[in-house]
């Protein structure tokens, strides 16, 4: 049997040319020998992109012989030295279905068909191949195609890679274009109408004509003609098939076909040019996105926000819940409890039994046992209001709540407002707030980047896109996730089979206030301003926790005006308040002695100090100077333990406090940013030092010439700075006293310094002189206006008399101030 060579042409950049050398199964094809054409002849249609068909030759297209869905393999290792056909042969499965393309093509043509196959040109991307054959005399192309189609109907071929679809064959009417461009087949074809000759004109085919030519290749979905008002040339129409394989067959069989005049092609005929049309053009999408930034940018921002809420919020809530439960889990862990007990036993053996109160505050807690029990009872009640622990700095508010009242409480969250307020910038504030409750992951650094993106978007579309979030929005997210975690913790002990399973979550929390966590907000209103976003969001969130029965909220503050911001959050509620002050003389003595007794048991030289304290009898007088402030008493006790006498320890406290006052209120270079002046602060220090009982009437201070303008605002600012304290009677300010009891001794110590006192008094006199001179200038200006009138009405005489009296009064004050100034200057000269 003769071998008949089959030539497979791969229209790729590598221009591979595979030679099929197996004999066909058709006996008639083995009678002739097809001589292989020269390379130049083969390269001719590769370079031109067209297949030359002679008069005695025909061309058919066979589909479904290559896996078109695996066309991405052509860009991989298969594009090297080994051909696509060889790779297919390696995965040949002849026992399952049709295998390699050569075998499929042999089976396409029946054995009785009198044709010779000349060439096979595969189209890998389209999943088919062109087969060129030679006709015998008297045989027509239609007869050959009909015979092949009839043969495939009775002997269907299903390749291994697509066993659910059969191989189909169609006659090529046009002049197909053999190209290796990156064009993906699709169900939609763009049919362009070109003239059949150089001097002819193309005719736009009707929908009926297009249907008659393309329906034979498969089910049509739609035919869309070019709009009549369109000026795009050449004219075109879109032909959509229901399946991609129909469109592939139609393109390869009809491309380059010239429609004659009798079939609607015009006088010179109309040649059709076909190419694949992608349904979605990425360039169109890109252009639409770039041309509609007002829609796209906010949509992207909303999408990012939705993704963030969906993915990160549950994670953040989980971490917050884990931080709330972390302490309890550690305490309830049996292994950790055993290790802790063994360590305690070892410490007792080697170091003796130690007290559980390292600061020896037992005497203080015994005195405040009523406040502790009151707070614990409030936490067991169902009251939708805030609990406020108020007192000056150093009175032990935090220790009383956390170490005593909540010592055995399961779940508690502590938020330190001072850390948040002292952070510089919104990014730092967000990070501090998140770390307090365990909110993570937090991308606070992205807030600055998002601000730049928002700024660029504002320049493009005129409004902000919403990428960046304000401090208000970020804090709202943090507190909202914290509230969700707190509610989960409060409901963690609830079981489905208990007696109260029929109650809703809200009803259960309302019925069991003991199950709610406790939120402690420390340093509330620290460094607060009129419009503080941090405190507004905290109070708003705390109100939601309280009214929703999610948690108990306890505020710790030194600000006496705490009711104003809290009333905005809960306007119709009465707050439960505990005011902590300085301890009494007896409690202070017990506190100091407990320190000294503990030091004596430790073997320190505090035993000698105990004897000195008893001999000198100065402990009570020293405690009276300190006034019962816990922090000052603790400092004095430690100085005594280190070897100092009580009086020396008190002197050290006075000296340190004096230095702090001078630095903050008298010699502060940044005084312009404060709400008070050096002269106002020194005036209060001087008058309080010279007062008999260490207090001044509130109204008397306001009547001073130094406090004529914004006097109450200045006093409140000095109270916030803890230089003074304002006591109230029935809610009205009544008296001004030093901010700390020891400050009375500090003020006296400062005024005893003649040089410092004279210098600061001289500054006050200068300010008063300047104020009176300005007043006289105003009076004189008004008198000048009145004197310029041509006739002075009788009604102005009273006004003129009043102005003259004011000028005289101010002049008398100026004379007095100048006399005082001269005396102070003499003192300064004498001291130097």
UniProtKB/Swiss-Prot annotation:
PROSITE patterns in the cross-refs: RRM
BP-aspect Gene Ontology terms: mitochondrial genome maintenance; mRNA processing
Membrane spanning stretches: 295-315
GO cellular component annotations of the record: mitochondrial inner membrane
Keyword rRNA-binding belongs to the record: no
Transit peptide: 1-40
Subcellular location: Mitochondrion inner membrane
Signal peptide range: none
Main location: mitochondrion
Mitochondrial matrix compartment segments: 41-294
Membrane topology field: Single-pass membrane protein
Every RRM domain range: 187-279
Family: Belongs to the YME2 family.
Role played: Plays a role in maintaining the mitochondrial genome and in controlling the mtDNA escape. Involved in the regulation of mtDNA nucleotide structure and number. May have a dispensable role in early maturation of pre-rRNA.
Protein name listed in UniProt: Mitochondrial escape protein 2
Classification lineage: Eukaryota, Fungi, Dikarya, Ascomycota, Pezizomycotina
């Amino acid at each position: 049997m003769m071998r008949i060579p089959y030539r497979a042409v791969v229209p790729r950049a590598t221009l591979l040319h595979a030679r099929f050398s197996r004999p066909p199964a058709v006996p008639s094809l083995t009678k002739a020998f097809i001589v292989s054409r020269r390379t130049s002849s083969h390269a001719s249609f590769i370079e031109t992109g067209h297949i030359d068909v002679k008069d005695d030759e025909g061309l058919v297209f066979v589909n479904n012989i290559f896996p078109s869905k695996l066309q991405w393999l052509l860009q991989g290792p298969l594009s090297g030295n080994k051909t696509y056909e060889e790779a297919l042969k390696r995965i040949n499965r002849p026992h399952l279905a049709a295998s390699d393309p050569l075998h499929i093509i042999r089976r396409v043509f029946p054995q009785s068909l009198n044709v010779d196959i000349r060439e096979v040109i595969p189209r890998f991307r389209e999943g088919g191949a062109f087969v060129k054959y030679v006709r015998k005399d008297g045989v027509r192309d239609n007869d050959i195609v009909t015979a092949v189609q009839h043969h495939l109907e009775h002997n269907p071929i299903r390749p291994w890679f697509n066993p659910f679809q059969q191989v189909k064959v169609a006659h090529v009417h046009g002049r197909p274009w053999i190209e290796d461009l990156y064009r993906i087949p699709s169900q939609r074809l763009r049919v362009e109408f070109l003239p059949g000759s150089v001097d002819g004109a193309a005719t736009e085919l009707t929908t009926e004509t297009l249907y008659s030519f393309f329906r034979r290749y498969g089910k049509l979905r739609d035919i869309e003609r070019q709009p009549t008002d369109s000026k795009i040339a050449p004219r075109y129409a879109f032909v959509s098939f229901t399946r991609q394989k129909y469109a592939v067959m139609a393109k390869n069989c009809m491309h380059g076909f010239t429609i004659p005049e009798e079939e609607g092609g015009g006088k010179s005929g109309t040649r059709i040019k076909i190419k694949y049309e992608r349904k979605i053009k990425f360039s169109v999408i890109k252009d639409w996105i770039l041309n509609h930034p007002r829609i796209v940018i906010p949509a992207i921002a909303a999408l990012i926000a939705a993704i963030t809420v969906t993915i990160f919020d549950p994670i953040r809530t989980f971490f917050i819940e884990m931080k709330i439960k972390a302490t309890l889990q550690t305490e309830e862990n049996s292994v950790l409890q055993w290790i802790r007990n063994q360590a305690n036993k070892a410490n007792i053996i080697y170091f003796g039994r130690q007290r559980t109160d390292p600061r020896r505050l037992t005497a203080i807690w015994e005195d405040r046992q009523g406040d502790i029990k009151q707070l614990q009872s409030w936490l067991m009640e169902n009251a939708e209001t805030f609990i406020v622990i108020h007192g000056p700095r150093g009175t032990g508010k935090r220790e009383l709540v956390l170490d005593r009242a909540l010592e055995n409480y399961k779940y508690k969250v502590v938020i330190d407002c001072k850390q948040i307020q002292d952070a510089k910038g919104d990014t730092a504030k967000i990070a501090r707030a998140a770390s307090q409750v365990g909110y993570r992951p937090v991308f606070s650094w992205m807030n600055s980047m998002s601000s730049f993106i928002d700024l660029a978007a504002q320049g493009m579309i005129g409004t902000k896109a919403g990428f960046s979030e304000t401090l208000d929005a970020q804090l709202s997210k943090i507190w909202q996730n914290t509230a969700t975690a707190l509610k989960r913790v409060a409901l963690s002990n609830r079981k489905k089979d208990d007696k109260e399973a029929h109650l809703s979550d809200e009803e259960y929390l309302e019925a069991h206030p003991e199950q709610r966590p406790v939120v402690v907000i420390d340093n509330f209103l620290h460094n607060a301003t009129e419009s503080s976003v941090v405190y507004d969001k905290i109070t708003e969130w705390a109100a939601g926790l309280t009214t929703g029965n999610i948690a108990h909220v306890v505020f710790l503050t030194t600000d006496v005006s705490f009711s104003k911001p809290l009333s905005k959050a809960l306007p119709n509620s009465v707050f439960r308040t505990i005011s902590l002050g300085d301890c009494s003389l007896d409690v202070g003595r017990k506190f100091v002695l407990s320190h000294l007794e503990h030091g004596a048991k430790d073997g320190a030289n505090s035993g000698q100090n105990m004897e000195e304290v008893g001999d000198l009898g100065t402990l009570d007088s020293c405690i009276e100077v300190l006034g019962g402030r816990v922090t000052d008493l603790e400092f004095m006790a430690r100085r005594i333990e280190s070897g100092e006498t009580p009086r020396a320890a008190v002197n050290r406290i006075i000296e340190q406090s004096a230095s702090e006052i001078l630095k903050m209120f008298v010699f502060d270079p940044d005084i312009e940013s404060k709400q008070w002046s050096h002269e106002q602060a020194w005036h209060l220090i001087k008058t309080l030092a010279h007062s008999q009982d260490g207090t001044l009437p509130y109204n008397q201070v306001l009547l001073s010439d130094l406090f004529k303008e914004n006097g109450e605002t200045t006093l409140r600012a000095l109270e916030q700075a803890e230089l003074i304290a304002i006591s109230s009677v029935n809610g009205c300010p009544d008296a001004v006293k030093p901010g700390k009891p020891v400050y009375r001794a500090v003020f006296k110590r400062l005024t005893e310094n003649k040089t410092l006192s004279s210098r600061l008094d001289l500054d006050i006199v200068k300010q008063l002189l300047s104020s009176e001179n300005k007043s006289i200038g105003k009076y004189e200006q008004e008198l000048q206006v009145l004197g310029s009138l041509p006739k002075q009405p009788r009604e102005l005489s009273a006004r003129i008399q009043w102005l003259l009296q004011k000028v005289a009064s101010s002049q008398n004050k100026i004379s007095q101030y100048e006399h005082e100034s001269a005396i102070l200057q003499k003192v300064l000269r004498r001291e130097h």
